[in-house]
From Swiss-Prot:
It is found in: Cell membrane. GO terms for biological process: transmembrane transport. Pfam families: BPD_transp_1. Residues 90-305 form the ABC transmembrane type-1 domain. Keywords: Cell membrane, Membrane, Transmembrane, Transmembrane helix, Transport. Belongs to the binding-protein-dependent transport system permease family. MalFG subfamily. This is Protein LplB. PROSITE patterns: ABC_TM1. InterPro entries: MetI-like (IPR000515), MetI-like_sf (IPR035906). It comes from Bacillus subtilis (strain 168). GO terms for cellular component: plasma membrane.
Amino acid sequence: METVPKKRDAPVLTAGKGISWMAALKRDKWLYLLLIPGLLYFLIFKYLPMWGVLIAFKDYSPYLGFWKSEWVGFDYFKDFFMNPDFFRLLRNTLMLASLDLLFAFPAPLILALLLNEVRKAVYKRCIQTFIYVPHFVSWTIVVSITFVFFTVDTGVINKLIMSLTGEQISFLSDADWFRPMIVMQSIWKETGWGTILFLAALATVDQEQYEAAIMDGAGRFRRMWHITLPAIRSTIIVLLILRIGSFLNLGFEQVYLMTNSLNRSVADIFDTYVYMMGITQGAYSYSTAVGLFKSVVGIILIFGANYIAKKFDQEGLF
C-alpha cells in the first residue's frame, strides 16, 4: 500500500529573528502604507526646514541669499550670551517655566483622578466634554476673556473686589501679577485636554485590585495612593520627561498678547525675544541662534530627565 506524503503547511511568518526585512515589509505592507501621510508631514514640515538653522552661523542677508551670505561661526551666540538682556530673559523664562511645571503639569493628573471617582457614566461624559472645550479656544480669545474679567475699570472680578474692599487690583499691568495670570490661563485652557492620556492610563488599572482593597477596608484615598498612582506611574514619568524637554517652550502667542509696557520687565522670554529680533528688527541670524540655543537646552534636558528616571529604576522615554 502506497503511503501518501503529508502536505506541508505554508510557512508562517512571525516577528522573530528568522524573518527578513523584505518579508516583514511585504507582510505588513498595508500598515506601512498608513504611515506614509504621517511620515510625509514630518519630512516636509519638520525635517526639511531644519537646514534653516545654518543661518545661525552665517551673516544672513535676504539680498545675498543663503549660499552667498558670509559664514561667521559662533559670533551670534557670543553676542547673545554677552547681551545685557540675556540673564533677564533667562530668569524670566525659567521662572515662568518652573511655575508652569509646578502647577500646570499636575493639574490634569489631579482632575483625571477626580473624574475616575465619578461612577455615573452620563455625568462623567458631560464633565469631560465641558473641560475639553477650552483647548479648542484660541489664545486670542482666552486673552480677550481675561481682559473682560480682570480689567481695572470694567472687569467683573475687579468690580467684585471693589465692592468688597474698596480697592482695585491691576491684574493686567502689575508685573507681580503677570506670572500668576499666565499660569491660570494655561491651567484653564489645557487641563481638560491633558486629562485624556491620564484617563486612558487609568482605564487599564485592574479593577480586581480595587475590589480586594475595598474588602480589606481601604478608603478612596488609600486606594488611589497604593493602587491607582503606582499603576499609572510609568505614564506620569514619560509625560513629565516630555514636559521637561519642552521646559523652555512656553509658547509665543499667549505671552506676547499679555505683554505690555508695564509688565515687560518680567514678561520678556526667549520666544518673544526671538520674534522681536527676527521679525520686527530683521536680525534673522541672531534670532535663529537664540532659537537654536533654546532647542539644544531642550535636548539636554530631555536626555538628562530620562537618565535620572532610569537611575531610579523607573521606566524612561527611551
